[in-house]
């Protein structure tokens, strides 16, 4: 095991321990590590759905989660900000050629260029 990630079982507790308050999140203050909070939220949702947590790295590329769903291995990229482009997801797709990829963000449902877009509020749909 070369590296690992740790997640807290409760995003509220994580926010409190990190000293983040709701005002900072609502205002979109850049000093708040919103990406880590969002990724942690998705991790807890995946665990609740029974998925073991795996991720993928290669060089400077990292895909947040890799799950097995209906005998398919699917990469999941989590985006907390408006920019949903992911070079790492593209690297993974070029290397492994999954049937499709999943992007979880604040954007609506959609499917474009082999990427299934799922809004954060609907992670339970996985």
Task: Describe the residue ranges of each PLM region.
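A broadly conserved detector of short glycine/acidic/proline-rich loop/turn motifs that flank catalytic sites
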Residues: 12-13, 59, 71, 80, ...
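Short, surface-exposed beta-strand-loop junctions and turns on beta-sheet-rich folds
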Residues: 23, 73, 82-83
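Short hydrophobic-aromatic micro-motifs
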Residues: 6-9, 76, 117
């Amino acid at each position: 095991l070369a590296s690992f990630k740790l997640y807290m079982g409760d995003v509220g507790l994580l926010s409190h321990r990190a000293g983040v308050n709701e005002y900072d999140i609502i205002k979109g203050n850049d000093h708040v590590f919103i990406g880590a909070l969002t990724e942690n939220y998705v991790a807890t949702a995946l665990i609740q759905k029974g998925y073991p947590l795996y991720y993928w790295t290669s060089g400077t590329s990292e895909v947040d989660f890799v799950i097995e769903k209906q005998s398919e291995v699917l990469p999941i990229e989590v985006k907390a900000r408006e920019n949903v482009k992911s070079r790492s997801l593209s690297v993974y797709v070029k290397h492994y050629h999954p049937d499709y990829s999943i992007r979880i963000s604040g954007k609506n449902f959609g499917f474009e260029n082999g990427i299934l877009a799922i809004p954060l509020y609907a992670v339970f749909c996985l």
